[in-house]
Design a protein with these regions (language model features):
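Alpha-helical membrane insertion/targeting regions
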Residues: 1-227
């Protein structure tokens, strides 16, 4: 399972980089995005399962949150159906559980003698908890009005995919150094790919928000395959 996890992770990083910088909605973006989705779902699920076996609660939270973000990001640009609405409802409950659990573990880490819990400092737990709870509020908005306008759905797709890629990128570049090639270990450049994901995410979110005000409603329809 570890080999599958590693291979899926590397595939996700490469496909995610292509999808992140490709023109959104274009053929390259769609194809690399689908590869990214499947690779991330495999990587996050195998990572969570291995973490359950090894009783690593922090990685379980990261794996479940990543799986949730990718799945709901994919559904955000699909044609709304009752089946997808049910999946979103279950995912919303999972995100709420992850968020509350992460915040609780963060408080436990604050009170611990070492200042960490399972080797993870409080800010990491609080970050996961905050993201999960914010995503839950977004799910509630979708649940209340399933046919939310396309601009909202596109931004929902963007930030969730990008944050899932952020988690994967941070895990690879800022995690245990033995994962990296020798020339990158100890390099001060390691945080750069992680920060770039956030920079590009905010760029695309800003671009969508600015264009949303002046484009016709047809522009906001779900992204569809054209070839």
């Amino acid at each position: 399972m570890k080999l599958i996890h590693v291979l899926a992770g590397l595939t996700a990083l490469m496909a995610g980089a292509v999808a992140l910088y490709a023109l959104k909605g274009a053929r390259l973006h769609r194809r690399s995005g689908i590869v990214f989705v499947y690779a991330m779902l495999v990587m996050s699920s195998t990572g969570a399962l291995m973490s359950v076996v090894h009783l690593n609660v922090g990685n379980v939270i990261a794996g479940v949150l990543t799986f949730y973000l990718v799945l709901t990001a994919l559904l955000a640009v699909r044609r709304p159906t009752l089946e997808f609405q049910r999946i979103d409802a279950v995912a919303m409950l999972a995100a709420l559980t992850v968020g509350l659990t992460a915040v609780t573990l963060g408080m436990a880490a604050v009170r611990s003698a070492t200042g960490t819990l399972h080797g993870i400092p409080p800010p990491v737990y609080f970050m996961f908890g905050t993201i999960a709870l914010l995503a839950t509020f977004g799910d509630l908005r979708v649940w209340r009005s399933w046919r939310t306008q396309g601009g909202f759905r596109i931004k929902r797709h963007l930030w969730r995919m990008c944050f899932a890629l952020f988690i994967a990128t941070a895990s690879f570049f800022l995690g245990p150094s033995q994962r990296l090639p020798a020339f990158l270990r100890g390099s001060p450049l390691r945080p750069i790919p992680v920060l770039l994901v956030l920079v590009v995410m905010f760029f695309w979110l800003a671009r969508v928000s600015l264009r949303q005000r002046g484009l016709p409603q047809a522009w906001f329809q779900p992204i569809r395959r054209t070839s």
